[in-house]
Amino acid sequence: MKLTLEPAPRCLHEYVSQLLEDWQPECLSCEYSHGGSSRPSLHDLFDLELENSRSPSPLLCDWCAEADSESTISTETDVGFTLNTPPVSPLPSYSTSPASIPEDMLLCLEEMPTFDDGDEVRSATTSFESRREKNFDPHVGSFFGCLRCAYYQEQGENSICGLCYLKALAEGKIF
């Protein structure tokens, strides 16, 4: 493998100008002068004429001009388009007061001793506190977590919810 080193350019401006000429895309015509006396201004480089915006630019190749004309046609069709939306109706007010909701309905399920008899998920012998005292091992199937996790673990699944997983991870029970 042979490496060739080019000497450092004497004038950075001339070097960059030469690179721009070498790498110039074929569809753009650059009128940048090499002389250091008259540098183009930003207005000269990015001069936009709004009067002739519908005609394709003479600086673009055929494919670019066609794509540009398609984009202007699609925006011209949207100019007169307005969307009529129906007015938003106000939200209905509910006559429930905070006093009508019992306080035990606002408690977290983890703090409740048991469900009602009709909705019993776990028995009195398998209380939530006794499950929490056992060490968590997902491969053995010991119970851990909230009531939802306990229900599925009683069904034979070795799963816990995301919140209980994070709690167990924070307590160091999952490595």
Curated annotation (Swiss-Prot):
It comes from the Viruses. GO terms for biological process: regulation of DNA-templated transcription; symbiont-mediated perturbation of host cell cycle G1/S transition checkpoint; symbiont-mediated suppression of host innate immune response; symbiont-mediated suppression of host JAK-STAT cascade via inhibition of STAT1 activity; symbiont-mediated suppression of host type I interferon-mediated signaling pathway. Coiled coil: none annotated. Plays a role in viral genome replication by driving entry of quiescent cells into the cell cycle. Stimulation of progression from G1 to S phase allows the virus to efficiently use the cellular DNA replicating machinery to achieve viral genome replication. E1A protein has both transforming and trans-activating activities. Induces the disassembly of the E2F1 transcription factor from RB1 by direct competition for the same binding site on RB1, with subsequent transcriptional activation of E2F1-regulated S-phase genes and of the E2 region of the adenoviral genome. Belongs to the adenoviridae E1A protein family. A motif (LXCXE motif, interaction with host RB1) lies at residues 106-110. Interacts with host UBE2I; this interaction interferes with polySUMOylation. Interacts with host RB1; this interaction induces the aberrant dissociation of RB1-E2F1 complex thereby disrupting the activity of RB1 and activating E2F1-regulated genes. Interacts with host ATF7; the interaction enhances ATF7-mediated viral transactivation activity which requires the zinc binding domains of both proteins. GO terms for cellular component: host cell nucleus. Its main location: host cell. The keyword rRNA-binding does not apply. This is Early E1A protein. One of its GO terms (molecular function) is zinc ion binding. The keyword Transcription applies. Keywords: Activator, Early protein, G1/S host cell cycle checkpoint dysregulation by virus, Host nucleus, Host-virus interaction, Inhibition of host innate immune response by virus, Inhibition of host interferon signaling pathway by virus, Inhibition of host STAT1 by virus, Interferon antiviral system evasion, Metal-binding, Modulation of host cell cycle by virus, Transcription, Transcription regulation, Viral immunoevasion, Zinc, Zinc-finger. InterPro entries: Aden_E1A. Residues 40-48 are annotated as: Interaction with RB1 in competition with E2F1. It comes from Canine adenovirus serotype 1 (strain Glaxo). It is found in: Host nucleus. Signal peptide: none annotated. A zinc finger (unnamed) spans 146-164.
